[in-house]
Amino acid sequence: MSELSFRLSRERDVPELTRLWREVFGDDEDFISEFFRSLWRPEYCRVAEADGKLAAMGFCLPGPVANGLSCAYIYAMATAEPYRGRCAAQRIGLELIRGAFDSGVHLVATLPAEESLCRWYESRLGMAPLFRKGGPGVEFPQSWHEFSRFCGEHSPETPDMLWAIPAPGVDTGPLRGLGWECCFD
């Protein structure tokens, strides 16, 4: 199997990103198209390539503000079946976090798709539980509210807490238990 190479996404990657998204998550074309229309920018996504196609992807979406601190959200981390176990998602996640911090974001959060992934986000990306799923607290741009409406109600199958990692020196104490409404779950 070919060596993995990592880079930022490009406009021309959208068909392959869509293919990988459908393959891993099974979402329909309307949902994926709405995400790309509402929230995606090439610089928000990192990919791994191998064998001439995308092997893994992850998105880090800036925009939320929690008690005056800028936040970003890791979303849709996905690795194609043949490339799993090669640490592609971990490397993409770490690069997304580093890029967010380099751009001035104070903390990066995510809502794991299922309880079993919480340990992965803790051990691989250094995240810990911080925000409550749903409810008031964190402020979001209008585009996030629009995509959240497209997503519908929160899934009872996702964890009740979002996991996060702060930039060095950021105190997360005042944020503990703050509500994070726009989870796209």
Model segments located where?
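Alpha-helical elements of the RecA-like P-loop NTPase motor core of helicases
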Residues: 15, 118-119
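Intrinsically disordered, low-complexity, positively biased terminal segments
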Residues: 1-2, 135-185
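Conserved acetyl-CoA-binding loop-helix of GNAT-fold acetyltransferases
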Residues: 79, 85-100
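Residue-level detector of high-confidence beta-strand sites
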Residues: 57, 130-132
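Short glycine/proline-centered loop/turn elements that form peptide/ligand docking sites
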Residues: 93, 116-117, 137-140
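A conserved beta-strand-loop-helix scaffold within acyl/acetyltransferase catalytic domains
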Residues: 6-9, 14-78
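Conserved active-site tyrosine of GNAT-family acetyltransferases
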Residues: 121-127
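Conserved GNAT acetyl-CoA-binding A-motif
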Residues: 100-113
